[in-house]
Amino acid sequence: MNQQVIIFDTTLRDGEQALQASLCVNEKLQIALALERMGVDIMEVGFPVSSPGDFESVQTIAKQIKNSRVCALARCVEKDIDVAAEALKVADAFRIHVFLATSDLHIESKLKKTFENVMEMATQSIKRARRYTDDVEFSCEDAGRTPIDNLCRIVENAIKAGATTINIPDTVGYTTPYQFGGIITNLIERVPNIDKAIISVHCHDDLGMSVANSITAVQSGARQIEGTINGLGERAGNCSLEEVIMAIKVRQQMLGVYTNINHQEIYRTSQLVSQLCNMPIPANKAIVGSNAFSHSSGIHQDGVLKNRETYEIMTPESIGLKEIQLNLTSRSGRAAVKHRMEEMGYQDKDYDLGSLYEAFLRLADKKGQVFDYDLEALAFINLQQQEPEFFHLDNFNIQSGSNVMATAAVCLVCGKELKSEAATGNGPVDAVYQAISRITEYPIELVSYQLSGKGQGKNALGQVNIVVECFGRRFHGMGLETDIVESSAKAMVHALNCVWRTEQVKKEKQRIQQNTKEMV
């Protein structure tokens, strides 16, 4: 009888560490809801003690998610565990994930402790976490380089203390599949109480073997896989969940295991994470890359036309990838747009129909016909920009040419006031940014600028993703228009609104603290 493999997603914790700018609470919630629809069993959504922002994100997601178990990370430190429990207590069901380094290198160089000290710290921390929940995971950080005798000892000890899931991370992506599978086999054969816990694996991709290591671990007896959407993560990233999930589905007969994932949601979730995290998906990325189901060789094309199974081991439809269609124009009504979104798998709560339809009409007037990829791009932008705006781009005008300094005049709505400025720059985009900076008077530094095309032909959309630094923090902005300069301007305005909201939160916290002091 096939056994279930639990899917543990850590996109919002481990995956976020790879981003140039942190996600805001609303963006994290959108990803969490998508993961819930996809059917992940556990989602690790943050490290609450690390910052007030992470605490707020974990708490917000814990309130909203009903069909997946929400998890938060904590070091083997009392405060970490208590803060994690406080953030999670609003959830219907939650897990606390405590971790501690177990390799000689980490214990001696980083922790400056002995292995016996580490054993005691793990025991006390697991027991403390069990005060709050009966679902506690313990991770042996750098397990891949931990002597097997020590690993067996601390795993047995952790289970005795109350850990219900034992996670074996290949923290630096060092092991090979044969070696990693052997570690799991050793634990199953040598730890007497191993049957009282689920063995989990968390593989990094430094040598490009994270998915292979995870699959080999499952063949050896592991029953939980940890990873991220699109393989996001520090350095070379984590185990790519869409890859490992589809490997289990396609090779289910050989592996003898299954997952509870809704495979039809894989592509859409991957696209959402890519857009919100400003991390483009390589064209040749397995499962979700734009070339994953394309065939250019004449021999391959002939085979696919005769029988798709000749060169396709899975179908695009199996991951929710629909054929691109051309069916909407400026004459299409709101109901038609809503119907098309439903056909693509979107639910009402995934987007705001009013703002989406307004953006659709503007685009349809420019392009004439709107494709599915256009509509999805607009939906993603609306998801990211649906929070109240303080700054709004009213209009702009540019003058540029060869051997001429670019000049831009920009009008911004700032609250209820219309402000305008002009500036020169090294090209039209830089000139627009200089003018916007003069209006807002924010000390903004452009860290990253990326331009990508959405669609085909002369009316393709230009998507601009930027990262700016302001007041010591980084913020992400996104713009989408047929005009690249306008798209660039809207990306900057989007980032500025993120800055403004952050500053408002800071001022409100200061006001509350001041009132508290006065009351005392």
Curated annotation (Swiss-Prot):
Major subcellular location class: cytoplasm
- From which domain of life does this come? Bacteria
- Record keywords: Amino-acid biosynthesis, Branched-chain amino acid biosynthesis, Cytoplasm, Leucine biosynthesis, Manganese, Metal-binding, Transferase
The cofactors named for this UniProt entry are: Mn(2+)
Task: Write down the EC number.
Answer: 2.3.3.13
Q: Which InterPro entries match?
A: 2-IPM_HCS-like, 2-isopropylmalate_synth_dimer, AIPM/Hcit_synth_CS, Aldolase_TIM, LeuA/HCS_post-cat, LeuA_allosteric_dom_sf, LeuA_bact_synth, PYR_CT
Q: What positions does the domain Pyruvate carboxyltransferase occupy?
A: 5-267
Chain segments carrying region Regulatory domain: 392-520
* CDD domains, per the entry: DRE_TIM_IPMS
Q: Which GO terms describe its molecular function?
A: 2-isopropylmalate synthase activity; acetyl-CoA C-acetyltransferase activity; manganese ion binding
Q: Where does Mn(2+) bind?
A: D14, H202, H204, N238
Which Gene Ontology biological process is one annotated for this entry? L-leucine biosynthetic process
Cellular component GO terms held in the UniProt record: cytosol
Reaction(s) catalysed by this chain's protein: 3-methyl-2-oxobutanoate + acetyl-CoA + H2O = (2S)-2-isopropylmalate + CoA + H(+)
- Location within or outside the cell: Cytoplasm
Give the pathway listed in the UniProt entry for this protein.
Amino-acid biosynthesis; L-leucine biosynthesis; L-leucine from 3-methyl-2-oxobutanoate: step 1/4
On whether Cytoplasm is a keyword of this UniProt record, the answer is: yes
- What family does the entry list? Belongs to the alpha-IPM synthase/homocitrate synthase family. LeuA type 1 subfamily.
What this protein is reported to do is described as: Catalyzes the condensation of the acetyl group of acetyl-CoA with 3-methyl-2-oxobutanoate (2-ketoisovalerate) to form 3-carboxy-3-hydroxy-4-methylpentanoate (2-isopropylmalate).
Q: Which HAMAP family match?
A: LeuA_type1 (MF_01025)
Subunit-level organization: Homodimer.
* PANTHER family noted in UniProt: 2-ISOPROPYLMALATE SYNTHASE 1, CHLOROPLASTIC-RELATED, HOMOCITRATE SYNTHASE-RELATED
What is the protein's name according to its record?
Answer: 2-isopropylmalate synthase
Name the gene: leuA
